[in-house]
């Protein structure tokens, strides 16, 4: 089995419901790294209020400022971090993340039909509720994320523990394979 570089802070971004939290938690476990979910950290700062309630209270600009404060307080250590579905699209937040040392920023991607099905099963994020066309809004957001992220990883719907392990290993092989140092 190859050796994986576990010195990076791995930031996972993607559309809502792509699996940032689920995959991030499994990847962190696979790599024996701490896991942070910025939505959960934000909620904890507001005594358990949901990101939706925080967004409704502060509006988009205030919500982004609260997300930025959450990220500023995030330890700069090797870990896996699941970002909110729109977090990276805020310029200040993007700059804060990309100016950190030794990071890996990866866009998680899924077939659009799978993602759309997942979104139908739970309440939409506030920023997507009043869009004339959900499909167009998602495509536009995805295009912006693709421009901002240097790496893309396609997730598949893994169900068994074996499949989940294979997906985590595939991610690590693609992005975290340690460079072998040849002997002199």
UniProtKB/Swiss-Prot annotation:
Monomer. Mg(2+) binds at residue 21. It is an enzyme of class 2 (transferase). It catalyses: shikimate + ATP = 3-phosphoshikimate + ADP + H(+). SUPFAM superfamilies: P-loop containing nucleoside triphosphate hydrolases. This is Shikimate kinase. NCBIfam families: PRK00625.1 (NF001866). It comes from the Bacteria. GO terms for molecular function: ATP binding; magnesium ion binding; shikimate kinase activity. Keywords: Amino-acid biosynthesis, Aromatic amino acid biosynthesis, ATP-binding, Cytoplasm, Kinase, Magnesium, Metal-binding, Nucleotide-binding, Transferase. It comes from Chlamydia muridarum (strain MoPn / Nigg). The gene is aroK.
């Amino acid at each position: 089995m190859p050796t994986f570089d576990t010195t990076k802070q791995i930031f996972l971004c993607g559309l809502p419901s792509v699996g940032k939290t689920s995959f991030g938690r499994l990847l962190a476990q696979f790599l024996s790294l701490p896991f942070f979910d910025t939505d959960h950290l934000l909620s904890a700062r507001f005594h358990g209020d949901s990101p939706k309630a925080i967004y409704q209270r502060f509006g988009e600009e205030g919500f982004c400022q609260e997300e930025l404060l959450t990220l500023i307080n995030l330890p700069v250590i090797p870990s896996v971090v699941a970002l909110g579905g729109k977090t990276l699209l805020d310029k200040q937040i993007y700059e804060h993340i990309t100016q950190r040392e030794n990071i890996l920023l990866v866009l998680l991607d899924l077939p659009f039909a799978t993602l759309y099905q997942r979104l139908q099963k739970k309440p939409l994020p506030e920023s997507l509720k009043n869009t004339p066309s959900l499909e167009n809004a998602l495509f536009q957001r995805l295009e912006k994320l693709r421009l901002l992220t240097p790496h893309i990883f396609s997730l598949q719907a893994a169900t068994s523990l074996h499949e989940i392990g294979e997906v985590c290993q595939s991610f690590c092989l693609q992005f975290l394979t340690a460079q072998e140092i040849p002997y002199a």
